């Protein structure tokens, strides 16, 4: 896709590309330039598809983190940083001007709450490490976003 989305059908294509993870920066740029008439029916379908894409990316990011082979400190840090980058990207996705302030705030809060939940879960699971090293790494390389 090489032009900014203007109608719902264009946005559906954009959301599919977003889900695939292909060329994130280019698709984000198109999303920022895109527009849509915010009216009943279209708005609900638009938000539904956007939330599906965002949830898909959130789930994929956490799955990739869990599947990564973290055998040493550097790999753990790299995995945490990759997870944070993905969360930051998803936050940029919902921060586009096409989305009204109320809906944008709700979406942003959903993603921020998810990042907080992931961080809490990581810290809780690190408590079983008797050396405290894993806990220190997780606390010093937080995945939480603002």
Predicted features, each with a name:
Residues 1-30:
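N-terminal leader/targeting peptides and immediately adjacent processing regions
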């Amino acid at each position: 896709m090489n032009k900014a989305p203007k109608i719902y059908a264009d946005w559906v294509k954009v959301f599919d590309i977003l889900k695939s993870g292909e060329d994130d920066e280019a698709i984000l740029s198109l999303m920022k330039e895109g527009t849509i008439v915010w009216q009943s029916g279209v708005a609900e379908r638009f938000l539904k598809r956007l939330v599906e894409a965002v949830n898909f990316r959130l789930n994929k990011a956490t799955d990739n983190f869990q599947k990564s082979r973290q055998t040493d400190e550097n790999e753990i840090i790299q995995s945490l940083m990759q997870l944070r980058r993905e969360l930051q990207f998803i936050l940029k996705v919902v921060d586009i001007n096409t989305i009204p302030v109320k809906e944008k705030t709700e979406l942003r809060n959903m993603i921020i709450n998810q990042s907080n939940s992931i961080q809490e879960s990581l810290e809780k699971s690190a408590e079983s490490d008797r050396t405290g090293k894993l806990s220190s790494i997780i606390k010093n390389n937080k995945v939480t976003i603002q």
